[in-house]
Amino acid sequence: MSFTVAVKEEILGQHHLSWHELSAIIKMSGSIGLSTSGLTLSVVTENAKLARHLYESFLHLYEIKSEIRHHQRSNLRKNRVYTVFTDEKVQDLLSDLHLADSFFGLETGIDEAILSDEEAGRAYLCGAFLANGSIRDPESGKYQLEISSVYLDHAQGIASLLQQFLLDAKVLERKKGAVTYLQRAEDIMDFLIVIGAMQARDDFERVKILRETRNDLNRANNAETANIARTVSASMKTINNISKIKDIMGLENLPVDLQEVAQLRIQHPDYSIQQLADSLSTPLTKSGVNHRLRKINKIADEL
């Protein structure tokens, strides 16, 4: 099950029926038709549970009977598509939800009453996500929430609603409509709180924390590996210089304070500067050992 499906199933499992949620779903997935008996309404979805939710919303909120039809999509995905269809009191339904325009179509914007009411806004965002929302799986590490709209002004209305909840929503116009999106993980988690998907929010945060912990460990390991590589490289340079001194002038001719450091470096090429400092008969600071190693390298360079 994808993360998007899990979020939608959590919302639908709460069995909340809302006029504003229904308004968003119809606005984003509905179409109006005309029959001999008047207007018809069809709402299309690939989610069987959402189709059932719509059926119950029509029945309990408006006492409208509808039917759920389905067919198999013929493209590569071959998903089953559900259509919730009704020809009962469609005009009354659209008028009550402030959805109908004067040309027997659906209004493209969002009603001002929804934009100005927090609870109505929550319900509308919930419906918008159920209809056309998606969240990239947090396991991917690339966080993105999208809500697709047919009309640009509707996408901008969705962005306005999200911004009222202090979410950094942006709108991108595409060839077929527009998309409202969030890209920050914190914004996506807050959105899940807004629509009441608390379990999904907790799951998202858990995955995010695990990923960040793994990344921190990897960075620490990479840094440690790089430090080891630098230590070995510096050690080998010094060892080569000590060998050069030994062959040309003999280590016994080095100043006494350098002889012990030179011997230790040859015996323990993998030691860090701190380990060398701790191993001297008279322990030194790291800077003290570094100073002596630089002296040894300088002597070798002058030979």
Swiss-Prot record:
The keyword Cell cycle applies. Keywords: Cell cycle, Cell division, DNA-binding. The keyword Cell division applies. Residues 272-303 bind DNA. Gene3D superfamilies: Homing endonucleases. SUPFAM superfamilies: Homing endonucleases. It comes from the Bacteria. GO terms for molecular function: DNA binding. GO terms for biological process: cell division; regulation of sporulation. InterPro entries: Homing_endonucl, Sporu_reg_WhiA_N_dom, Sporulation_regulator_WhiA, Sporulation_regulator_WhiA_C, WhiA_LAGLIDADG_dom. Involved in cell division and chromosome segregation. Belongs to the WhiA family. This is Probable cell division protein WhiA. It comes from Streptococcus pneumoniae serotype 4 (strain ATCC BAA-334 / TIGR4).
